[in-house]
A protein has these predicted regions:
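Conserved short histidine dyad/triad with adjacent acidic residue
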Residues: 75-100
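N-terminal leader/capping segments at the start of a protein or of a new domain
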Residues: 1-68
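Double-stranded beta-helix
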Residues: 146-189
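A short secondary-structure junction signal
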Residues: 116-119, 124-126, 145-146, 165-167
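Conserved metal-binding segment of the jelly-roll/cupin
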Residues: 127-147
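Short, conserved beta-strand element in jelly-roll/cupin
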Residues: 98-118
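Polybasic, positively charged surfaces/segments
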Residues: 72
Length: 189
């Protein structure tokens, strides 16, 4: 189940709000400029699927988003718990960073946790299958896939170079909860 926890950025122990209703999550995130939608993830895709398989399965949705928002590139990240580079992939995204473009992800399978640092608050968004999140350019955030990653996500970019981060140098990400492994990860290896 998708979830949003909102914290004061000085207090990582107790959230000031916890939301699990998609409409409530979308409303709360929309107020800070973050896009959050629930889509049908109805193609039979599992972590480990090839990029070509995933893109082919969702080609019409990808084309529509690219046309609506001017995205120039698309790729797929697909990880499961036995991926040999899972620790390196995880550490790449765990520190607070920004981008010069929106960060848009559609979760085709599994889950991942985006944590956004906006206006003195921390928005911890657990994205699951069917969730689309759009983090505006310049928004400080980090991403956790857990120690046992289990997800497939389509990534859309306006920059043809793909994922390019500017790290803030702040240690705030170290003070907030990490993502627990997805329940499906136990059976995925």
């Amino acid at each position: 189940m998708s979830r949003l926890r909102i914290y004061d950025d000085a207090n990582h122990d107790t959230p000031v709000a916890v939301l699990e209703d998609h409409a409530a999550i979308a409303d709360a995130l929309g107020k800070v400029g973050v896009r959050f939608e629930q889509w049908e993830a109805n193609q039979p895709i599992q972590p480990g699927a090839s990029q070509d398989e995933v893109i082919a399965a969702y080609r019409s949705d990808i084309d529509r988003l690219m046309q609506e928002n001017g995205y120039q590139a698309v790729d797929v990240i697909s990880l499961k718990p036995d991926h040999p580079d899972r620790a390196a992939f995880r550490s790449k995204f765990l520190n607070e960073h920004t981008h010069s473009e929106d960060e848009v992800r559609f979760f085709v399978a599994g889950a991942g946790q985006f944590t956004l640092h906006i206006n003195g608050q921390v928005y911890e968004v657990l994205c699951e299958k069917g969730d689309l999140i759009g983090v505006p350019d310049g928004t400080p955030h980090w991403f956790d896939m857990s120690v046992s990653p289990y997800f497939v996500a389509i990534r859309l970019f306006t920059n043809t170079e793909g994922w390019v981060a500017k790290f803030t140098g702040e240690d705030i990400a170290e003070r907030f909860p990490r993502m627990d492994p997805h329940p499906s990860a136990a059976n995925a290896s």
